[in-house]
Regions:
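Extreme N-terminal basic, low-complexity initiation segments
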Residues: 1-13
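Intrinsically disordered, low-complexity, charge-rich segments with an acidic bias
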Residues: 2-5, 43, 50
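Short hydrophobic targeting helices and cationic amphipathic motifs
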Residues: 7, 38-42, 69
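Short, low-complexity, intrinsically disordered N-terminal modules
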Residues: 8-10, 22, 51
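Tryptophan (W) side chains
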Residues: 19-22, 38
């Protein structure tokens, strides 16, 4: 990673207090207005830590969440919007990821040409591959030396891809990862059936791993994900959804597969019960953070960078966290605007975006994501320090500071 420039001009006096050997707080007295929050970059021992207390600025579009340590011996400040480079984060497992891609390509083989065509289309669209990377990274972080993690990482990617195929049909989406969705290209029926094929193929591959515990984790995950899909369906066009009810959907629909991916990696490595629980907690909370940032990006991101239409959640009548916050904290007029937008899926996007901005809804969602990432980071304290543990920590930074 290219080290960011030191940014101190105009920031006034910086005070740092240490607690328990870790940087716990950054206090700042500011001369004049500062148009962004700052995260801090403390080079120590190549370990990444998330601060519990951060400085605030009302005009910040994105809040800082993380600090990154390297062995250069000095403190730097970096903008809150600083985005980590995902390929660099997964560099320690780059060979493993290539092996996983080979497994994916091989296991997509089918005598039915349409299955290969659709599966190749959606898998070939790319994506972050965070879930399979999590299997690999957690297994390596706990000392795994075999190669079954390639198979299981591919299983996790197949499950994820199946959910995308089904999601796009349910949501009637037409754009994903910067190109037409599979259902837009090949029709709803074919997309659903190929999703079913990928689920079936993933279970076939699970059996090869020879672990009932791993099968239990992944089969439970697929059940919970399906429950999350149904819960989300019940929430659509309902403006009275609470934050807790929404977060239940996030935990079921999105975070559960992150949780399963990390947990499978731990089990494969022969983790203790305590390590397995910590791995599951890490995945669950980083998955939640990931989805909450998606909520933010749906109202603040760029369609080309995201690879999907900005405002899709609103058009689909989905009450995500920014909208729920306006319903709870907005003026009567703002609440009525959002209520109508959720109920109809047809509203003035600019007016909705202004209500979200005025109530600080994006900042609230970003802070919630940062809090989840902090919990994920602390779950990794049980792991031995290694390049793999460091990358898992850096995933926390990527999850909350990404722009796509």
């Amino acid at each position: 990673m290219t080290e960011p420039k030191i940014l101190t001009r105009g920031c006034g006096k910086v005070k740092i207090s240490l607690w328990g050997g870790w940087l716990a707080r950054l206090e700042r007295s500011v001369r004049g207005a500062v148009p962004a929050c700052w995260a801090f970059y403390l080079p120590v021992a190549s370990v990444l830590v998330i601060p519990r207390i951060i400085c605030e600025a009302p005009t910040a579009a994105r809040l800082p969440a993380l600090i990154h340590h390297r062995a250069s011996g000095r403190l730097s400040l970096i903008p809150a919007g600083y985005v980590l480079n995902l390929p660099e984060l997964i560099a320690p497992i780059s060979d493993d990821m290539k092996a996983v891609d080979a497994v994916i390509r091989g296991r997509l083989d089918s005598e039915v040409v349409l299955i290969r065509t659709i599966a190749d289309y959606i898998i070939g669209a790319g994506g972050k591959r965070m879930r399979p990377a999590m299997v690999l990274m957690m297994a390596r972080a706990l000392g795994y030396q075999g190669d079954h993690h390639h198979l299981l990482a591919a299983v996790v990617e197949f499950i994820h891809t199946a959910t995308l195929l089904h999601d796009d049909v349910v949501d009637e989406s037409d754009l994903r990862r910067g190109r037409e969705t599979a259902n837009a290209m090949f029709g709803n029926a074919a997309s659903v059936l190929v999703g079913d094929y990928l689920y079936s193929r993933s279970f076939e591959m699970m059996v090869e791993a020879g672990s009932m515990r791993i099968m239990q984790i992944l089969s439970e995950a697929t059940t919970v994900i399906a429950e999350g899909e149904v819960l989300q369906l019940l929430n659509v066009h309902d403006p009275d959804v609470s934050q807790e009810r929404y977060l239940q959907v996030v935990r079921y629909k999105t975070a559960k597969l992150f949780e399963a991916a990390a947990q499978v990696g731990a089990v494969l490595a022969g983790a203790t019960a305590e390590q397995e629980a910590a791995a599951a907690a890490y995945g669950r909370h980083i998955g939640t953070a990931f989805q909450l940032v998606d909520d933010v990006l749906d109202y603040s991101g760029d369609a080309q960078a995201l690879g999907k239409n900005v405002g899709d959640d609103l058009r689909e009548g989905k009450p995500t966290l920014p909208l729920i916050w306006v319903m709870e904290q907005g003026t009567p007029a703002q609440r009525e605007l959002i209520r109508n937008a959720i109920q109809t899926g047809d509203a003035d996007f600019a007016a909705v975006a202004e209500a979200i901005r005025a109530t600080g809804a994006l900042e609230h969602a970003q802070q919630a994501a940062s809090a989840e990432a902090d919990i994920a980071r602390r779950a990794l304290d049980i792991l031995p320090i290694s390049v793999y543990q460091k990358s898992l920590l850096e995933f926390c930074a990527f999850a909350v500071n990404r722009d796509r």
